[in-house]
Amino acid sequence: MVDSKTPAKTKLLDSSSISNVRVVLRVRPFLPREISDESCDGRSCVSVIGGDGGDTSEVAVYLKDPDSCRNESYQLDAFYGREDDNVKHIFDREVSPLIPGIFHGFNATVLAYGATGSGKTFTMQGIDELPGLMPLTMSTILSMCEKTRSRAEISYYEVYMDRCWDLLEVKDNEIAVWDDKDGQVHLKGLSSVPVKSMSEFQEAYLCGVQRRKVAHTGLNDVSSRSHGVLVISVTSQGLVTGKINLIDLAGNEDNRRTGNEGIRLQESAKINQSLFALSNVVYALNNNLPRVPYRETKLTRILQDSLGGTSRALMVACLNPGEYQESLRTVSLAARSRHISNNVSLNPKVETPKVKIDMEAKLQAWLESKGKMKSAHRMMAIRSPLMGTNQTSISQSSVKKLLCHRSAIAESAKLAGTGQRDAFVTARNLFGVETLAASHLWEPIRNLQLASPTKEDERDTSGEENLLVSEASLRDNTLDVEKKYTELSPLREALSPIDSNAKPNSAHGSSPFLKPMTPKTPFLSTNPEIMQMEGTCQKFNAWSNNLKTSLIKEYIHFLNTANREELRELKGIGQKMAEYIIELRETSPLKSLTDLEKIGFTSRQVHNLFKKATEGVLEKPVSASTTP
C-alpha cells in the first residue's frame, strides 16, 4: 500500500482540488571547460535569501549582472544550489510526493525549462553515477507496483520541428494530436511498452534516447534539438489509471551566439517559436484572458493539461550560473508560472472485464427483445386505424392501392415547389431546422406483415372503405406533423405562411396531395403592431427587421452548437477560426454577434461574416408563383 506518511496524502485523496504550478530553481555547477576559461571568475550570478531547498515556504532569488551591477529579485517555491547531487534532492522533496497520487488516478507533470546548456537534459536523464528524474521516478513507481500489484507502461516521444514522433518505434511513426469532446488531448498512434523491471525500462528508454534528435552547437557539444516527453502510466487493481509526464524541453537559443546555419537555424527557430508560445500561454493564464493560445504549437497543446489543466505540475527552472541574461529570461517566466492554478481531478475508473461480459449479455438480450418488439409492433399494426371497424386483416390489393397513393403524394410534393419540398426532408442547415420526413407516417405500412389472399379476403367488400378511413387518418397525421414542424422552426416567428386554399376535408374525400392546386402567394402572419402601420413599405421594412433578428438568433445558435466541420462550411470561417469559436463558447456561450470580437474579429469583420452567411440563403432560387 501507499505510505501513509506522504505529505501530500490528504490532498491526493480528494476527488478534485486547486493546485498551483510549483516552480523550483536548479543552478548547475560550472563545467570544467568553463572553469578553465580566463573570462570566468567562478562567481554565480544567482543567489538566494529566505530559505533553501528543504524549506516549503517560498524563497527570494536574486540575479546580479556582474558587468552592469543590475539586480533582479523573484519569488519562487524552492532553490537548489550547485551541489553535484542536487537532482536527487529535487526528486526526494519535489517529485516523490507526486507519485502516490498516480496510483489513486491523478495525473502529474514534471518539466525542465531553461536556456540551452543550462542542464535540463542532465536533470531529467542524468548519468549512470547520478541518475536523473526520469530513472528515479521509474524506479520508485516499479517498487510501488510490486507492493500494490499494479502495472506500469511507458511511452516516449519527441516534438521536433513542431511534429510529434514516437521514439519507441523502430520506424518513423508520426503521432497525431487530437482533442476529444471534453477537450482532453490525445496522441493517436503513440505506442506503449509494459515495464516490470529497471532493466526492461533501461532497454526501451535508452533505445528512445538514441533516436532523439541531438546535434553539436556553438554553446553545447550535445544539444537537444527537440522536446522529449516520457509518459509513465500506472493501472492499479481497481483499473484506475494515472500517469506522470516527464518533459525535457529544448532550450531557447540566441543564434547570434550559437552561429547556427542551415538546418540548425531552422531547428532553433522552431524551438524558440514553441517556447515563445509557451510564454504567451503563461501570460494569458496569469491575466485571466478569455482565450489561452494553447493551439499555437504542438508543445503548448501537449502542455495544456499541465498549465491550467487537471494535472499537478512541477516546473524545474534550470540556470547556468555564469549567464545573467539567459537566467533572467528563465526565472522571469518561471516566476509567472507559479500563479497558474490547475483544477486537479480524479480520472474516471476503467470498465472491468466483468462489466464488458455483462454488456455482451445485455446486447444479446436486447437482440432477443428486438425480435419480440417486432412481433408486438406487428400486433399493434393489426389494431391500427388502417384495419377499419371490423379489425380484420387488410388485403394485399388494398395495401397496393395505398402504396400507390404514397407515390402520388411524393409526386404532389414535388409539384408544391421548393418551399414545401424542404418541409419533407430531414436535414441540418445553417439555421438548425430539422424537419420531419413524411416517411414517418408510413411506418405502420412498412412494418406490416402482408398475409396471403384468401377467399374470405376476396369476398370482403369493406377493404375500400378501410382504405378511405386510412387516408383520412393520414391527412390528420399530416396536419399534426405540419403543426409540430411549425413549433420546431424558430423562423416561423417571423414568417408564417397561411394556406388560403385550405378547405374542410370529408372523411371519404381524396387526399389534398392527390390534387395539387396552383400555389398562391403566401401571406405573413398578422402582427397587430405591424398591421396598424400605414403604407406597404413600412410593413415590409418591419417584416424585414423581424426576419433579420430571427436570422441573427439562428446564426448565433448555430455557432454555439455546430461542430468544427460544420463551422468550417460557413463562408469566412477556416479551421483555426472554428477552433477559436469552440474555445470561446466553452467558457461562455455566444449571446450576440459582438461576442465574436473576443477572438480577434473587428465589428466590420463580424458584419461581413454574417452577411456572407445570409447571402447563401438569399441567393437560393425562389419558385415563381402567380396569383389569380
Curated annotation (Swiss-Prot):
Regions of compositional bias (Polar residues) in chain numbering: 498-509
Keywords: ATP-binding, Microtubule, Motor protein, Nucleotide-binding
Domain Kinesin motor, first and last residues per copy: 20-340
One Pfam family in the UniProt entry: HHH_3
Transmembrane intervals: none
CDD domains, per database record: KISc_KID_like
Keyword check for Nucleotide-binding: yes
Binding site for ATP: 114-121
GO molecular function: ATP binding; ATP hydrolysis activity; microtubule binding; microtubule motor activity
This protein's record includes keyword Nucleotide-binding: yes
One GO BP: microtubule-based movement
Record's signal peptide: none
Family: Belongs to the TRAFAC class myosin-kinesin ATPase superfamily. Kinesin family. KIN-10 subfamily.
Protein name according to UniProt: Kinesin-like protein KIN-10B
Gene Ontology annotations for the cellular component aspect, listed alphabetically: chloroplast; cytoplasm; kinesin complex; microtubule
Residue numbers spanned by region Disordered: 496-519
